[in-house]
Regions:
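Class I SAM-dependent methyltransferase SAM/SAH-binding core
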Residues: 63-113
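Conserved alpha-helix/loop element of class I SAM-dependent methyltransferases that forms part
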Residues: 30-51
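Conserved Class I S-adenosyl-L-methionine
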Residues: 208-255
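Conserved class I S-adenosyl-L-methionine
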Residues: 155-181
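Class I SAM-dependent methyltransferase Rossmann-like catalytic core
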Residues: 17-32
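Acceptor-substrate binding/catalytic loop of class I
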Residues: 177-193
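A short glycine-rich, Lys/Arg-flanked "PGG" loop and its adjoining helix->strand segment in the class I
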Residues: 138-153
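A conserved beta-strand element that flanks and buttresses the S-adenosyl-L-methionine
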Residues: 125
Length: 255
């Protein structure tokens, strides 16, 4: 595309319909609309779709863009929960996209101390945020699952690496080290590590786990943004870091 946003060999019809300038203004990492769309479409194709009318917790919602995306295209009601984002700003985003607080309700919340009733939500989405808090083995069972109804679904898109950062022995490949230190990459796990973590959970069933095919495109969209964080990551992507970077889709069902 001439505007610099990347393309793919098959369509992501919902996310590709958004104004690239708006997306660049609001995203904080690899394009979350594309990660969200592929995750939910793949889940639906394998029998774990997000039902219209559901009450959804969008955890780590950032600017609120993914929350508005969910409400607009999946006909769900969304509570947008984020520790660092401003709830008023997130509601402004929803209103810019033709929605209201009845569609998207932003709240200030810490993922490790969620202020919601037990079994309040039909589903949870967490797009490119779960690895900030979910690496704690106790998080899912003790902090998140109590707020999801039995039979409810959890949809995750988790940024990661093709291997554990420890496998590099403290010396990153140059295409990674030009932007990041080993310490900065410790929160990026390979898919296999997430598989082992979730397989050990007694209160969920893993419905789906795989790497997203839109990963490279989502990263390229991010480094095309005009902000210092994207600029800092751009050198790695231009040097070939996509050979190491992944995004893992995980779909869990509470038992």
């Amino acid at each position: 595309m001439s505007d610099g946003m990347s393309t793919r060999p098959y369509p992501l019809g919902r996310s590709n319909g958004y104004d690239p300038a708006l997306v660049r203004e609001l995203i904080m990492g690899p394009n979350p609309l594309k990660l969200c769309e592929e995750t939910l479409d793949d889940a639906a194709a394998h029998g774990s779709g997000l039902a219209p009318g559901s009450l959804v917790l969008d955890l780590g919602s950032g600017s609120g863009l993914t929350s508005a995306f969910l409400a607009a295209h999946w006909q769900v009601r969304v509570v947008a929960a984020d520790l660092w984002g401003n709830p008023t700003d997130a509601l402004v985003v929803a209103r810019r996209l033709g929605l209201s607080a009845q569609d998207v309700l932003p709240v200030h919340a810490d993922a490790c101390s969620l202020p919601f009733a037990e079994e309040a939500f039909d589903a949870v989405t967490c797009i490119d945020a779960y690895n900030y808090f979910g690496r704690d083995e106790a998080f899912l069972a003790q902090r998140l699952l109590p707020h999801v109804r039995r039979g409810g679904l959890i949809y995750l898109a988790i940024s990661g690496l093709t291997c554990d950062v420890a496998d590099f022995g403290g010396v990153l490949p140059p295409e990674l080290s030009c932007s990041w230190t080993p310490e900065q990459l410790e929160y990026l796990w390979p898919r296999g590590r997430w598989e082992r973590l979730f397989a050990a959970e007694g209160d969920v069933r893993v419905e789906r786990i795989r790497d997203l095919s839109c990963n490279d495109e989502a990263w390229r969209d991010w480094v095309a943004c005009d902000n210092p964080y994207a600029a800092g990551d751009r050198a790695a992507i231009e040097a070939g870091a996509l050979a190491w970077l992944t995004t893992t889709e995980v779909v869990l069902r509470r038992l």
